[in-house]
């Protein structure tokens, strides 16, 4: 009878340990899945912030182009290029398209500023300098927001590519995300 109690007690202890380990594993999987979902939500929020920074820059550009478009009729291709770039940015739906369109917009902005300074230097006023400062500020915000997005994207990609996240990703269909290309504006000179 004493041996049976020891066997029974040992069996219950073993089952308890196995049950505890299973609970820990399930709990950790749930924790990882919740973390992945939180990162996914954060990615969406960061992407919204990047788009808001693009829109703020667009409003500043409207001021600048409004001041110069009528005076720079000979260089209407500069404005056409900028309008097409802005339209491509508005149509972009994923991170890669947004990133590529942003590079085109930045190139068009640089071209506009270069033409202004080169051919229409006599039109520059303190008001224009203020708008150029606003554009620089908008670019800094874009760099900050895209860097924030990229940091979360790297965490998200790491979480879904490594165990146990990769296991959960295959079950729940999580896919990796791309990062934005970040322009180093310090390298740009006119």
Language model features with spans:
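A helix-centric hydrophobic-segment signal that preferentially recognizes long
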Residues: 2-190
């Amino acid at each position: 009878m004493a041996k049976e109690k020891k066997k029974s007690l040992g069996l219950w202890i073993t089952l308890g340990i196995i049950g505890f380990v299973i609970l820990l594993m399930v709990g950790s999987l749930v924790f990882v899945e919740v973390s992945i979902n939180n990162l996914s939500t954060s990615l969406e929020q960061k992407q919204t912030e990047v788009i808001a920074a693009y829109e703020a820059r667009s409003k500043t550009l409207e001021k600048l182009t409004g001041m110069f478009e009528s005076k720079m009729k000979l260089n209407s291709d500069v404005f056409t290029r900028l309008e097409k770039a802005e339209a491509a940015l508005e149509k972009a739906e994923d991170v890669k398209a947004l990133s590529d369109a942003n590079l085109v917009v930045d190139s068009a902005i640089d071209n506009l500023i270069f033409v202004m300074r080169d051919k229409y230097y006599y039109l520059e006023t303190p008001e224009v300098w203020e708008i150029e400062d606003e554009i620089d500020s908008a670019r800094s915000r874009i760099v900050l927001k895209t860097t924030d997005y990229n940091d979360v994207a790297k965490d998200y990609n790491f979480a879904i590519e490594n165990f146990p996240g990769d296991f959960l990703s295959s079950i729940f269909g999580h896919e990796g995300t791309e990062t934005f290309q970040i322009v180093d504006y310090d390298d740009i000179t006119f």
